[in-house]
Amino acid sequence: MISVTGIGIISAIGNNTTETVTSLRLGRSGIGEVRYLNTVHHSLPVGEVKMSNDELRTLLHIPAGTFASRTTLLGVHALRQAIADAGLSVGEISARRSVLISGTTVGDMDVVGHSNVIPQWSLGRETRDMATLCGLDVEVCTVSTACSSSLNAIILGCEMLRNGEADIVIAGGTEALSLLHFNGFRSLMILDSHPCRPFDATRAGLNLGEGAAYVVLQRSSEAGHTRAFIKGYANRCDAFHQTATSANAEGAYLAMTGALRMAGLQPADIDYVNAHGTATPDNDLSESRAIRRVYGKLDLPISSTKGMTGHTTSASGSIETVLCILAMENGFIPPNVGWHEPMNEGILPYVGKDTVSLENVMCNAFGFGGNDSSLVICRSGEEGTLRKTAGHSGRGEADEHCGRDEADGHGGKTCEETARHSVGEIVSDVTIDNVEQLKDVGAFIPPMAARRMCKLMKAAMLTSLRALRESGLETPDAIVTATAYGMRENSVKMLNDLLEYGEETMSPTLFMQSTHNTIGSAIAIQTKCHGYNITYTQGEKSFEWALRDARRLISTGQAENVLVGWHDETDDGGIFSRSLILRK
């Protein structure tokens, strides 16, 4: 069993857990006029943290000369809270097999939006910076699956603990408002000019927010004290479209049912669902359909807290995990602020209720590309009845001894050596390192579709589909992607336009194809893969993390085969794409 032993949070509704509980109980929204983001679009409300960068630096005792983006500052603030809440010292954490796993999409882009320097978009640097500023000497990992990033960070942390790869994991996510993603969402025409209204008939879009939240995770047998237990989780893919969801919300449905199955719970056992609930017409309708598929006609309390915090994108999953834990501890259901009129085919959200007992809670986080994840959080550490018989994935129980004698997670070998010789067999391995090799993409992708792809996407598609064909597969069980810099070509184009021409020029097409999980989700869409889907972006360590995950999926029986890819543009404008199939 996995225990949450510490929590930390900062968002538009509070700089700590005490302030956050007060805001939740009062239904106090943190959404308002732009104050700190230097944008021309002041008519669009946002959920900003109520502190400037200078105020955050002063609070955190970070010297002015030390580089730290707003994303980093928010993350450090929440991290320090979580560590203190767990009753652990930095020295104790550093002396154990400990890991910091963070989810983000923006990274340091809030700094770039105010400079003439376009960096290599390395999200992994931000996670390393946070560890350094917190004094942590630990392994670091960055997950980037858009709006499900931080929930997937928590899932990864639980998996590492269950399989003996770590003793302490600090997992969550951080995201600051930036001109890049603010105008990117604006280009998609999904930002509301009024405070958002999740699941309301008049909903007209989301309000972006910012913040950070982290949880300290430990095996329950080693936990000093426990605030909550994480019993179930699932990461699935809708495999439909980069920004839209399928009509029956297959990814969301699979994530929720998978989390329930792992927890050993029936739908009737869940006392509250914290919905993703972005207030966009598409999300709220599809999520309502998915919830009805899972829970039927159960009179189940459901609400979205984004009417208070705004949509904190990559940080939303961990922020809402902490909100769920606070609601469980204090006996209330967070209100669905802004809701007044039922929507057609929609769920009826709770507007808030005090004095309730919440034993089992589900938290949803759904991202661009159909990267959908769900988490089941419980007050009791007792095993669910289904879990005892069904196993973790339905394919067999995890090997609880896997990796326990491996201090660095791969026994001193490189991860590739471990993947080849310890768990699984590489049955196909395809590499492209020259743009000229892209001429073969027509054998796999129609010309019209290929014309809309940047060169890195073409390379990733070509190596992935060729590896699948060589291994005799059409659809992999899981897709694990590594990329140090993501869709750099598209990102640089957007940043150049933003810096040279201003905020009115953002291309919605480029924005949709700029997130680090674009490649993994596009491959899932192409191959109709609804299984586990994650993207690692930790610099030169990205591929190692991907191989470790693929190995874990196979050793725990969660997958028979995994498509693992490493896709990056080189500094000289070239490309490198490698895809392999790891099979049991």
Feature annotation, model-predicted:
Residues 1-138, 159, 178, 186-207, ...:
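Conserved "HGTGT" condensation-loop signature of ketosynthase/thiolase-family condensing enzymes
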Residues 168, 173-175, 568:
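Acidic/serine-rich, low-complexity amphipathic helices located in mid- to C-terminal regulatory regions
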Residues 156:
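Internal active-site segments that recognize and position negatively charged phosphoryl groups
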Residues 165-168, 558-560:
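Alpha-to-beta junction loops
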Residues 142-144:
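Compositionally biased, intrinsically disordered linkers/stalks adjacent to structured regions
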Residues 150:
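Short conserved active-site loop signatures built around small residues
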